[in-house]
Amino acid sequence: KRSWHQTSRCGLAGGRDLYLVTLSDPETMGRLGHYMALRKIMLEDPEKALEMIDQFDTFKVPIFINGSIHGNEYNGADAAMRLIETLAFDNSPETLEILANTILLINVVHNPDGRVLGTRANANGFDLNRDFITQSQPETRTVAKLIAEWNPMVLLDLHGYYYPMLIEPCTPLHNPNYEYDLFIKWALDEALAMEAELLAQTGFKAQIPFLDDADGWDDYGPNYTPMYAMYHGAYGHTLETAYQDERGVDAHYWAVWGALKFASRNRVEMIRDQIEIFRRGFLDLPQMLIPDEILSQTDYDQYNELTLQEFPAAYIIPASTPGQVSPHQAARLVDFLIDNDVQVHSALQSFAFEGTVYPAGTYIVWMDQPKRGLANTILDAGRDLSALEGLTFYSPPAAWSNPLLWGAARVIMPDRIEVATVRIDRAVPPVGSLETGDSGYYAFLPNSLAAFQAANEILKGGNLYRASEKFEDSG
């Protein structure tokens, strides 16, 4: 016996739905709220969570399987359907073991519009697997919310087509905002388990970029589904099946099955290291280099010294002028951080930093928090890798910085100063104003998305002019 339920999320680019199927044994499904509460303890008190693992060994770990983010890579969704059928009806010891130890979250097809249209992109023409740090598309926002809610221990993203089948982890350069030593410790062994299951069941071979290649398949960019999930503590893998026919479905199915068995049997030790990721951030502990015993398994330089990050004490985000050109964009940035499970605080009183006085209500992102890596990825300007020679990237890193992209000012606080703050769950919505009295014209600066939207609304029914030179009015 086992239980499952299906939920749908609608409002996608082309009007179709996403379907999430959740499977486990009946006892687990009756206590879903309890298990989700346990996941929250990992973030609120990681040390208490570690103690709970010592006391109870009946906890379940969530595993997220993501089918066909690229619509024309059909095998991923087909393999997801086959996995659902097995997990729902099969009574073999392996299946029952997996259901007893895990909660399976299966997003059947991440890009239903692309699947119907036969396209890699969604109905808006976006490659959804380049969107996770911007989240411009509804499909991305939906899946990002699920990942942030569940903090899955493992995420498997099903793609095609590479020969032989490709199973991550990746080549360098590794993004320094991960806790890569903890990630690779389990991701590599899990990949080897997938490779072994694939070979045993199908005779197909696989490549593991971390072991088999010097470069060219890196996890530096945070835009991909597994890389985004890594900021939430997941052991994330992209799987690229080799064949477009039924053999490709077989390969995905058995590789995933190998991962499910591995995670089920090693969940206690794996969850400890997932919690350790959060504990390091929570206590502002230093990162660690990839251990020598792992480096010795590959012939290729992992640029280990570049896997470490110097985190600031905090980021200051002014809420209004003069420190912030656009309060709307500041609020947008703050809400984006909160939506992605990054903790944001508000100053309870004014404070001075580097000669500037910031008023009460200024936003502060303290970096001693469980998901500091994601916070820093969003807020940091990044590293200049121009001088790095002899290394090829899968997609040459573009500059990503949400503050720079959206025109929101933020200030780095290298060392902590004492500021009384309170955690918030939403930015204060900016309120505009309009001068009263007789006027021939109104003027405003187009310095936010809201301002451009207002300009477009005006153009629908009236005249709008753009100043060709600087001017002053009433001072």
Write out the residue ranges for each language-model feature.
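Core alpha/beta catalytic barrel or barrel-like domain that forms the active/cofactor pocket
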Residues: 107, 114-121, 155-171, 236
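Acidic active-site catalytic centers that drive phospho-/nucleotidyl reactions
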Residues: 127, 157, 240
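Amphipathic alpha-helical scaffolding segments
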Residues: 81-83
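Mobile, glycine- and charge-enriched loop segments
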Residues: 75-77, 89, 95-137
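Catalytic-core regions of hydrolytic enzymes
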Residues: 128-155
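Intrinsic-disorder/low-complexity accessory segments
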Residues: 1-74, 88-90, 95-100, 130, ...
